[in-house]
Amino acid sequence: MKRTIFYPLLSLALILMAGMTTVAHGQDFNGTWSGVIDVGQPLTIVFNIQQTSDGVNITWDSPDQGVFGLPATATISGNELNVDMPISPRATFKGILEGEALNGTFTQGGYGFTLNMSRTGKVQNNTRPQEAAIESDTHRPYRNEDVTFTNGDIIFSGTLSLPDKGSHFPAVVLVAGSGPLDRDEEVLGHKPFLLLADALSRNGFAVLRYDERGVGATVGGDPGAPSEPLATDAMAALRYLKTRPEVDATQVGFVGHSEGGLIAVMNAAKHPDEVAYIVSMAGPGVPGKELGMAQTQLGFKAAGLEFGEDLMKLNEDFYTIIATEKDSVTMCNKLANFFHEQEGNPALQLYLKGVTPEQYIKLYALPMVRCVFQYDPAENLKRVKCPMFAINGTLDSQVACENNLGTIKRLVPHATVKAYEGLNHFFQTCAEWKGSANNGAIHETMSPEVLQDIVNWLQQVVKH
């Protein structure tokens, strides 16, 4: 659920902008260029270049991460190509064209990597077989309806999936993780909420999924809002479902992923008479400080890096400031002082992972980020009275499986909890620890076992 920069490199906090560049003259850079950088593991970088009479169009791909057509700008002068990639941390490439070779340096966050490229054929996009199977099925036993509902002056747009047979359906609202995200919770080409809606609707549930504030067809609202206002959005969705004649108004609940699991717990605690059941998929059970500290450690583990005592001390001091300072200005000032005091500490640059202190401060000053790491779910978890299913993958590098599930079970004794061996934060099957930036390289969007377990658990709950 962390809304931060991933390590190894190539965070996908993209700035969407036109890929038009300038060109001085003559050299032929046309085509698809591919090469590999070594960031502790091989990572393929691809530039797609088309020279025109008006200039040059350029996009770039990171196929190992499953992302394609990313925006870039560039300048060409003689046989030199300079590319700027507006990601965070910012990345650049400077290369020299020598025949059919384009050799240079890829730089991000102050680190430079040799990148020798050759002209190649078009790199194929990774397939998403689970989505493809759903989208190609012309005989689905349910129908999809475009719907709108409101929360204050925000008009939310979503998709309501209704089974073809029967009536008076139990229902769920799907609540996405840290975003803002669309109704499918699409990340790196994966659409986990499409899969959940399909699985549940095939098994007798009405399912509502919606574009979050400022996303897709939803009109209004701050896309950077913290969790509490987002929880009111989810309640508006649930209350809309209760107005539908096809829905059993006594059997409506939430399935939330990551921050969506946090929101499901919030609403179950605050509105016990309205929320019939909740499923928390990698939702947090521990306080925000503990969550953040574990995320950083797991990120280093995923990158194959040691996390010694010096880094542990930096980590604890950093998250203590974030967790305890409720005033944003005070927090930012204390973080600035913290980084200044640590300038001579050799562990600091390793901890920063190529990101500047200013970038860190700016990120954690965002309300939608700060709220997560200042939140302690304990009181809300203790107040959950409805049936609850809490799940985690053992290779989750964002919400540590053992601590979070253990805490949830302790605070909600009646909850059903399950840990899935070898699954990551998105419930994809992984062979080993990987950072979140690797999720796009995995063809699987969600483990079929997880999908079936959620269906089975909900079916058992609504029977009682």
What does each model-found stretch correspond to?
Residues 384, 390-392:
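Short beta-strand/loop motif that positions the catalytic acidic residue
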Residues 279-379:
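Accessory cap/linker subdomain of secreted extracellular hydrolases
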Residues 27-98, 103-111, 141:
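Central antiparallel beta-sheet cores of small beta-barrel/beta-sandwich binding domains
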Residues 124-167:
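N-terminal cap/lid segment of alpha/beta-hydrolase-fold proteins
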Residues 195-217:
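Conserved alpha/beta-hydrolase
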Residues 386, 399-410:
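Short alpha-helix in the alpha/beta-hydrolase fold that links the catalytic acid
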Residues 224-245:
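Alpha/beta-hydrolase active-site loop
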Residues 168-178:
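Short beta-strand element of the alpha/beta-hydrolase
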